[in-house]
């Protein structure tokens, strides 16, 4: 049984685990978190994992769910000094109406420019510890000042043993299968699901994101398997359309390659390099580099890739 939030449409959010039991974690990590929830109270915690998509934010929210805490969620980038003194202080200082423990989750508090907020949080944690706990998530533990680390239980997780890896991948395959069933996505070849999990492990967030992209036609079949397993072959269709300045065809090709942008953009630059004039090589790297820089914040990755195609089609001089 998996949690389904019907208010969400992005699969990663729609099927985010809500309990520690539902989270896919190394056995030792899961026992650590279950021992915390069994006590009914959450201490000050720093959840640290250098790998993205391993579940730091999900675990933080699941801990709060499992102890029925009154949770306030804050993006680390928003947690400036005035925010700590204002909204965070107001939340932590007020008693919960129903007597529940209050917990503030500060997500990715290791970002640059937050040292002043971190220093102020030291006294904040001590002042309101009887009423409110803090959970901090961080990719880089060095981004959290030492005095703050000393006031928290630092839990570094996402480091599975070989046995853990096998079990976690099995759990993820079962989870993806359940998601496909709920979404009405036909699995014509289970090798696709297994390949998705193996390719992205331990980044389960990316795994579900790619499932969302690859399943846009409602089926996972052998045709998609070659994309997932890196057996992608040539990109002659794109190169030919770029040479011909075929904007309509380039727009049609964008969905095919948007799902694996990081591989594709490198392959595209590699292929174009030997096919254009020396003057165009510099401009090609400028265009591709800028597109790559802003890919992470693009609202629609297919349109983002189509824009790259059109720029290259208009500006490249082919040999």
Curated annotation (Swiss-Prot):
Its EC number is 3.6.4.-. Pfam families: AAA (PF00004), Gp44_C (PF21429), Gp44_lid (PF21328). It comes from the Viruses. GO terms for biological process: bidirectional double-stranded viral DNA replication; DNA repair; DNA-templated DNA replication. ATP binds at residues 12-15, 24, 53-58, 205. One of its GO terms (molecular function) is ATP hydrolysis activity. InterPro entries: AAA+_ATPase, ATPase_AAA_core, DNA_Rep/Repair_Clamp_Loader, Gp44_C, Gp44_lid, P-loop_NTPase, T4_Clamp_Loader_L. SUPFAM superfamilies: P-loop containing nucleoside triphosphate hydrolases. Keywords: ATP-binding, DNA replication, DNA-binding, Hydrolase, Nucleotide-binding, Viral DNA replication. Belongs to the Tevenvirinae sliding-clamp-loader large subunit family. Forms the sliding-clamp-loader together with the small subunit. Functions as an ATPase enzyme. The clamp loader holds the clamp in an open conformation and places it onto the DNA. 4 ATP molecules must bind to the sliding-clamp-loader before the latter can open the sliding clamp. ATP hydrolysis triggers the detachment of the sliding clamp from the sliding-clamp-loader, freeing the sliding clamp to track along DNA. The sliding-clamp-loader consists of 4 large subunits and 1 small subunit. Interacts with the sliding clamp; this interaction allows the sliding-clamp-loader to open the sliding clamp. Part of the replicase complex that includes the DNA polymerase, the polymerase clamp, the clamp loader complex, the single-stranded DNA binding protein, the primase, the helicase and the helicase assembly factor. This is Sliding-clamp-loader large subunit. It comes from Enterobacteria phage T4 (Bacteriophage T4). The gene is 44.
């Amino acid at each position: 049984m998996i949690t389904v939030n019907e208010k969400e449409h992005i699969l990663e959010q729609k099927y985010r685990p809500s309990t520690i039991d539902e989270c896919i974690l190394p056995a030792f990590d899961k026992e650590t978190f279950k021992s915390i929830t069994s006590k009914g109270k959450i201490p000050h915690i720093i959840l640290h994992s250098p790998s993205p998509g391993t579940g730091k934010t999900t675990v933080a929210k699941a801990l709060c769910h499992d102890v029925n805490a009154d949770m306030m969620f804050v993006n680390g980038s928003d947690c400036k000094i005035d925010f700590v003194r204002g909204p965070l202080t107001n939340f932590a200082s007020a008693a919960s109406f129903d007597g529940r423990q209050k917990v503030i989750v500060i997500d990715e508090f290791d970002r640059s420019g937050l040292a002043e907020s971190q220093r102020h949080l030291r006294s904040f944690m001590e002042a309101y510890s009887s009423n409110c706990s803090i959970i901090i998530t961080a990719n880089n533990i060095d981004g959290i000042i030492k005095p703050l680390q000393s006031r928290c239980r630092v839990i570094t997780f996402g480091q599975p043993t070989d046995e853990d890896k096998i079990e976690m991948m099995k759990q993820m395959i079962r989870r993806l299968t359940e998601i496909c069933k709920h979404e009405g996505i036909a699995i014509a070849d289970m090798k696709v699901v297994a390949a998705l999990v193996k390719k992205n492990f331990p980044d389960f967030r990316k795994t579900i994101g790619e499932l969302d992209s690859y399943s846009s036609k409602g089926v996972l079949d052998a045709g998609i398997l070659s994309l997932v397993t890196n057996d992608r072959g040539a990109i002659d269709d794109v190169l030919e359309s770029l040479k011909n300045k075929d904007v309509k065809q380039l727009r049609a090709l964008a969905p095919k390659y948007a799902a694996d942008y990081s591989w594709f953009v490198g392959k595209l630059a590699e292929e174009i390099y030997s096919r254009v004039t020396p003057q165009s090589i510099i401009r090609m790297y400028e265009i591709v580099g800028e597109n790559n820089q802003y890919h992470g914040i693009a609202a629609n990755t297919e349109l983002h890739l189509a824009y790259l195609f059109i720029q290259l089609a208009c500006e490249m001089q082919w040999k």
